[in-house]
């Protein structure tokens, strides 16, 4: 037979999770900025090419909605998925910037092309 105290703990855990999620969702909908706090997090995270590869515009609202209500999951996700190499992609803007080296005008101070 299933112990009675496990029912109580499971009920209160479920109630707490549902209360937090519903209350946060209500406040976000009431204020009209449901993705506001998560967009601030994505602003820095999407500078890395790993996040550019992984997150698309169709997936981002799901992550925004999920991690807005579960902030510690966002930190775990950010810790495990952050790439230590920001310039890892072939066509990243950082690599395009230095693809052809420095421009002629910055190589020579007199402005002559050699």
Curated annotation (Swiss-Prot):
It comes from Saccharomyces cerevisiae (strain ATCC 204508 / S288c) (Baker's yeast). Keywords: Membrane, Transmembrane, Transmembrane helix. Residues 90-114 are annotated as: Disordered. The lineage of its organism: Eukaryota, Fungi, Dikarya, Ascomycota, Saccharomycotina. GO terms for biological process: ascospore formation. It is found in: Membrane. The keyword Membrane applies. One of its GO terms (cellular component) is membrane. Its main location: membrane. It is a single-pass membrane protein. The keyword Transmembrane helix applies. The chain crosses the membrane at residues 7-27. This is Putative uncharacterized protein YPL205C.
């Amino acid at each position: 037979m299933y112990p009675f105290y496990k029912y109580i703990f499971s009920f209160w855990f479920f109630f707490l999770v549902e209360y937090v999620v519903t209350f946060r969702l209500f406040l976000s909908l009431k204020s009209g900025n449901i993705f506001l706090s998560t967009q601030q997090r994505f602003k820095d995270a999407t500078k890395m090419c790993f996040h550019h590869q992984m997150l698309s515009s169709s997936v981002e609202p799901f992550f925004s909605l999920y991690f807005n209500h579960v902030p510690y999951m966002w930190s775990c996700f950010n810790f495990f998925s952050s790439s230590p190499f920001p310039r890892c992609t072939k066509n990243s803007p950082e690599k395009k910037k230095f693809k052809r080296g420095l421009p002629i005008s910055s190589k020579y101070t007199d402005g002559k092309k050699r």
